[in-house]
Amino acid sequence: MKIEEVKSTTKTQRIATHSHVKGLGLDENGIAKQAAAGLVGQENAREACGVIVELIKSKKMAGRAVLLAGPPGTGKTALALAIAQELGNKVPFCPMVGSEVYSTEIKKTEVLMENFRRAIGLRIRETKEVYEGEVTELTPCETENPMGGYGKTISHVIIGLKTAKGTKQLKLDPSIYESLQKERVEVGDVIYIEANSGAVKRQGRSDTYATEFDLEAEEYVPLPKGDVHQKKEVIQDVTLHDLDVANARPQGGQDILSMMGQLMKPKKTEITDKLRGQINKVVNKYIDQGIAELVPGVLFIDEVHMLDIECFTYLHRALESSLAPIVIFATNRGNCIIRGTEDVASPHGIPLDLLDRVMIIRTMLYTPQEMKQIIKIRAQTEGINISEEALNHLGEIGTKTTLRYSVQLLTPANLLAKINGKDSIEKEHVEEINELFYDAKSSAKILAEQQEKFMK
């Protein structure tokens, strides 16, 4: 007798840099806890982000911009991801990097506009009228063919539907009769018919017929419990970019040209302003009718100093348009030259007139104690045991070098501990690994000392 164990098919999730961030870690009054939801320290910045989240949720923040500014490794990207976690999956969050806008196929401004539209959601509410029940009768009514001849045409179909609450007799259009034939509906089947579109769906055979012996294996379903005529509300979430793409490249077409077009490599197409204008008109009409509501989301642009002066000028116009999301910039630059200009220096590499429109949130350097806490959280996330001594030593390394470097030493040190037959990382493992690798500062120091030996 052979017994096999079934292995789980779930994919093992790779631990990314910010896997441990679960939210902003604020209490009910919006005050930041010292360490919560994977974030440590940065209380002022987290509280400011909490205010931004509240403004976004109350839809009072659209078209504004926020800048997260601070030295490298102080948690700017982590804060942006925490904002995304706080907002939940119903609010669109579109992350991008400043260098993404440079493409050989489409304009820089087009890439920006695409991401702007990705960050604006549309929640469409649709009420569907549905007739559901077990078919008790199915009678097509025929009339003489108006075109002459001996054939007859179906004028309408009488169908009886039964549920646990009652029965109804419906008179249906002849076009629905074709759908009934396609679905092979017979008396005793449970079906539902959509009133708006006329779509028919056969759910299965009623379970009162389950005792019948049939050659074909049927799926038996219980008798529907509610009324025959029901109204269901369906909510769909789409982004404006989804609507743009759907209308820019309509699928289908049976002629040879469209067939060839589908076979060829799809080139990235630019969506024209005219098309976007028409989509905006339709969206505004839906909003006025109350069918849809606009959900302004978040566009997160990391390394914003990589954008050039043309992109910044375009951002001015985009931020002031009626359909604009909340834009969060992040940069680690101090005073530097704006890309695309010869000698115009500006704080954070952003033009002063755009800086004037943004609310700036500063992130501060971590204290040694906070660094230790972050390293401890990372070790727990990666499932690594670490002794107190090793943790203190890693905290010291982080203070001298950078937080990223000390976090990166965790996995190699864990590997070394396992080779030595230890369950947890000890101080000597960290010291040994630290001697093998260089951080950025010590590497630059060696480079300065041995400059003449390197190629110019």
From Swiss-Prot:
Q: Where is the signal peptide?
A: none
Any idea which UniProt keywords this protein has?
ATP-binding, Cytoplasm, DNA damage, DNA recombination, DNA repair, Helicase, Hydrolase, Nucleotide-binding, Nucleus, Transcription, Transcription regulation
Biological function: Has single-stranded DNA-stimulated ATPase and ATP-dependent DNA helicase (3' to 5') activity suggesting a role in nuclear processes such as recombination and transcription. Proposed core component of the chromatin remodeling INO80 complex which exhibits DNA- and nucleosome-activated ATPase activity and catalyzes ATP-dependent nucleosome sliding.
Q: Which GO terms describe its cellular component?
A: dynein axonemal particle; Ino80 complex; MLL1 complex; NuA4 histone acetyltransferase complex; R2TP complex; Swr1 complex
Q: Which PANTHER family match?
A: RUVB-RELATED REPTIN AND PONTIN (PTHR11093)
Q: Does the keyword DNA damage apply?
A: yes
KW Lyase (keyword) present: no
| Catalytic activity as recorded in UniProt | ATP + H2O = ADP + phosphate + H(+)
Query: What EC number(s) are associated with this protein in UniProt?
Result: 3.6.4.12
The compartments listed are: Nucleus; Dynein axonemal particle
Q: What is its main location?
A: nucleus
A Pfam match is TIP49_C
Record protein name field:
RuvB-like 1
Choose any GO biological process term that the UniProt entry carries and state it.
Answer: DNA recombination
Q: Which SUPFAM superfamilies match?
A: P-loop containing nucleoside triphosphate hydrolases
Species whose genome carries this gene: Xenopus laevis (African clawed frog)
Gene behind this protein: ruvbl1
Q: Which family does it belong to?
A: Belongs to the RuvB family.
Binding of ATP occurs at: 70-77
